[in-house]
Swiss-Prot record:
Biased composition (Basic and acidic residues): 68-80
Alphabetical keyword list: DNA-binding, Homeobox, Nucleus
PANTHER family cross-referenced by the UniProt entry: MCG113260-RELATED-RELATED
Database matches in Pfam families: Homeodomain
Result after altering G68R: Found in infertile men; uncertain significance; decreased induction of target genes expression
Effect after changing D235G: Found in infertile men; uncertain significance
One GO term describing the cellular component: chromatin
Protein's GO biological process: positive regulation of gene expression; regulation of transcription by RNA polymerase II
Name by which UniProt lists this protein: Rhox homeobox family member 2
Organism: Homo sapiens
């Protein structure tokens, strides 16, 4: 004979089919809810990043608002007080991130400023115009050093490299300074020589070129020289009757120097003295 407990369980299993159906329905509803939640999560993951960012921001704002309301309510419930903490933590994190971004920007600016400070002198140097280019530094020699350099220049205008190096070592200057001094001194000497040549050429340019006279004109010339005066210059009244041209005379403002004037002929040879022209022989041959 079976015990009474097993008999009661068997009887209840036979008499309660509706209870099993309700459990199956509850299990089905739970499975459907889990499937819907999974589908929603997949859709949220498939959303673009800006939308996810906005959704996360809205969630953070709502969490912060709930935390603030629960904090204002006095914190009677522990769960409410604990829920308000994450909102403040998120706000603190956001402020910390913003502060960190500001620090990063400040560090970037601090890193850029030294570069700008270093780049300013380069701009100042590179901004020079061609006309304002820096000239090489010229060493200022002492009077004794200048005398020594002049003495060497009078002896040798183009010193060798060995001599320049020895002078630079003895004067405690650079070889470049000695070379520049000799170059400037040679340029000055050339300018002085050109000025002397130009000054000596001016009187010769004022006198003019000699006149070319043929042999026939030279033979007939003494017949017309009787009108020559004692001062060796032609009279204006006789200049028109001569057959050969007169040499040009300088203007009154530029008198000839005494050293360039021709010598005065003696009184007895005034008529047949030396002539201020060149005689060119010319012969004619008879036609055969």
């Amino acid at each position: 004979m079976e015990p009474p407990d097993q008999c009661s369980q068997y009887m209840t299993s036979l008499l309660s089919p509706a209870v099993d159906d309700e459990k199956e329905l509850q299990d089905m509803n739970a499975m459907v809810l889990s499937l819907t939640e999974e589908v929603k999560e997949e859709e949220e993951d498939a959303q673009p990043e800006p939308e996810q960012g906005t959704a996360a921001g809205e969630k953070l704002k709502s969490a912060g608002a709930q935390g603030g309301e629960e904090k204002d309510g006095g914190g009677e419930e522990k769960d409410g007080g604990g829920a308000g903490v994450p909102g403040h933590l998120w706000e603190g994190d956001l402020e910390g991130t913003s502060g960190s971004d500001g620090n990063v920007e400040d560090s970037d600016q601090s890193e850029k400023e030294p570069g700008q400070q270093y780049s300013r002198p380069q701009g100042a140097v590179g901004g020079l115009e061609p006309g304002n280019a820096q000239q090489p530094n010229v060493h200022a020699f002492t009077p004794l050093q200048l005398q020594e350099l002049e003495r060497i220049f009078q002896r040798e205008q183009f010193p060798s490299e060995f001599l320049r190096r020895r002078l630079a070592r003895s004067m405690n200057v650079t070889e470049l300074a000695v070379q520049i001094w000799f170059e400037n001194r040679r340029a000055k000497w050339r300018r002085h020589q050109r000025a002397l040549m130009a000054r000596n050429m001016l009187p010769f340019m004022a006198v003019g070129q000699p006149v070319m006279v043929t042999a026939a004109e030279a033979i007939t010339a003494p017949l017309f020289i009787s009108g020559m005066r004692d001062d060796y210059f032609w009279d204006h009244s006789h200049s028109s009757s001569l057959c050969f041209p007169m040499p040009p005379f300088p203007p009154p403002s530029l008198p000839l120097p005494l050293m360039l004037l021709p010598p005065m002929p003696p009184a007895g040879q005034a008529e047949f003295g030396p002539f201020p022209f060149v005689i060119v022989p010319s012969f004619t041959f008879p036609n055969v």
